[in-house]
């Protein structure tokens, strides 16, 4: 099942029972949430049956889009999410439930959507996305809708009035249906004006502007960088203790510039930008589940003078083993809320795949680092600990492949 797997949940829709595999750290991992079920019920009427091309924006493990696909056998459904783990689980759930004509892929908002002319766009709007992002998720659907196409969204109750005001205050929006409960609100709406199907989805750079929060600068070991940070990512104004420890470990090493460096979970881009400013690696590979982190880090590297041809991004749950085999240096910020088994498996893979003489710098809570070192010792991998530092419950360790 894999280290992220938590359980299987069920969803009854269109006379079928779907069995959906759920990851521990995806939204609504206990059961299909009430808001999703409410939105599906509002779309169950015969008037919606002819909506053939469907986009599920922010799909998670797929209950909305796959539920709509199960309800109408001639539908084609696109499932998109900025989280590669969500995309992976949506794809697996479509296959496990024998639902064809389903595409699952990564997209930052509408920027990477592979089609236009959708008859229906659905979304369970994330409550913590930030006002500019929520506005884009609600109004940006005009870029991909067919003429007469419908948008159907569900929001939690605290967002109800804000969303209603935004939709009712937009002259091209016609709200055609509303339903509210104590905890959720559903809105169905259309866009007037010129046909939207001729529109082209915004490019990733334009989409990224919606997430921009502020400018911030950091100096470590005499190396200074300045970033444009984003909503939805940590460390928007300063470095956390773990990032400081990893940055200091890299700057302290004083070794020759790496030909290829890989940064796992780059966040806002502090580590790759500090590494670029200090060592000028020949290639910088950025790997993350979160497409926002990849795009923000890439933009910040370019703003700090890194040539675009040197930056490569991988929207993946874990690094591609082939991308590790020529890496001289790997910086891995281990995700704090990831299942312990997943974190350990990632570290074992990193150390097993890098070439002899390459180094891995791990950053995490001290307990996590100790557990990973014990797993490496038990696996008897040829690796030595070069350095380890601790501060405020955080830890960074430098490992070298022998």
Language model: regions and residue ranges:
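A short helix->loop->beta-strand "cap" motif at the edges of active sites that frequently abuts
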Residues: 74-75, 149, 281-282, 355-358
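Conserved beta-strand signature within the Rossmann-like core of class I S-adenosyl-L-methionine
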Residues: 148-156, 357-365
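A short SAM/SAH-binding and catalytic strip from SAM-dependent methyltransferases
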Residues: 119-132, 328-341
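Conserved SAM/SAH cofactor-binding pocket of Class I
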Residues: 34-123, 242-320
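Class I SAM-dependent transferase core
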Residues: 1-46, 196-253
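A short glycine-rich, Lys/Arg-flanked "PGG" loop and its adjoining helix->strand segment in the class I
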Residues: 135-147, 345-357
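Class I S-adenosyl-L-methionine
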Residues: 2-4, 157-220, 230-233, 366-402
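General small-molecule cofactor/ligand-binding pocket signal
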Residues: 21, 103-105, 176, 311-314, ...
């Amino acid at each position: 099942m894999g280290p992220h797997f938590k359980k299987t949940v069920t969803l009854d829709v269109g006379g079928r029972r779907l069995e959906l595999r759920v990851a521990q750290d995806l939204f609504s991992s206990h059961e299909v949430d009430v808001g999703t079920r409410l939105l599906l019920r509002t779309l169950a009427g015969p008037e919606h049956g002819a909506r053939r091309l469907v986009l599920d924006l922010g799909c998670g493990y797929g209950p909305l889009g796959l539920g709509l696909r199960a309800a109408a056998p001639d539908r084609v459904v696109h499932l998109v999410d900025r989280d590669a783990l969500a995309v992976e689980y949506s794809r697996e759930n479509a296959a496990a439930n024998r639902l064809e004509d389903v595409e699952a892929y990564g997209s930052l908002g509408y920027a990477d959507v592979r089609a236009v002319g959708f008859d229906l766009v659905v979304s369970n709007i994330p409550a913590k996305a930030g006002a500019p992002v929520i506005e884009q998720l609600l109004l940006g659907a005009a870029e991909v809708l067919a003429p007469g196409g419908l948008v159907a969204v569900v929001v939690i109750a605290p967002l109800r009035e804000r969303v209603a005001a935004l939709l009712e205050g937009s002259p091209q929006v016609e709200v055609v249906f509303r339903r509210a409960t104590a905890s959720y609100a559903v809105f169905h709406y259309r866009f007037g004006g010129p046909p939207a199907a001729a529109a082209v989805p915004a490019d990733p750079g334009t989409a990224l502007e919606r997430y921009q929060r502020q400018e911030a600068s950091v100096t470590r070991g005499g190396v200074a960088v300045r970033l444009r940070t984003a909503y939805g990512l940590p460390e928007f104004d300063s470095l956390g203790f773990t990032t400081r420890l990893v940055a200091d470990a890299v700057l302290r090493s004083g070794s020759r510039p790496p030909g290829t460096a890989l940064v796992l979970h780059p966040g806002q881009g502090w580590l790759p930008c500090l590494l670029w400013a200090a060592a000028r690696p020949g290639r910088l590979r950025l790997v993350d589940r979160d497409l926002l982190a990849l795009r923000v880090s890439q933009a910040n590297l370019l703003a700090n003078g890194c040539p675009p041809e040197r930056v490569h991004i991988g929207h993946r749950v874990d690094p591609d083993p082939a991308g590790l085999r020529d890496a001289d240096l790997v910086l891995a910020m281990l995700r704090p809320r990831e299942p312990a088994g997943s974190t350990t498996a990632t570290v074992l893979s990193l150390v097993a795949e890098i070439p002899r003489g390459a180094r891995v710098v791990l950053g995490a809570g001290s307990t996590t680092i100790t557990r990973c070192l014990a797993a490496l010792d038990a696996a008897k991998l040829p690796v030595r600990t070069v350095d380890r530092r601790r501060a405020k419950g955080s830890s960074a360790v430098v490992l070298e492949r022998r």
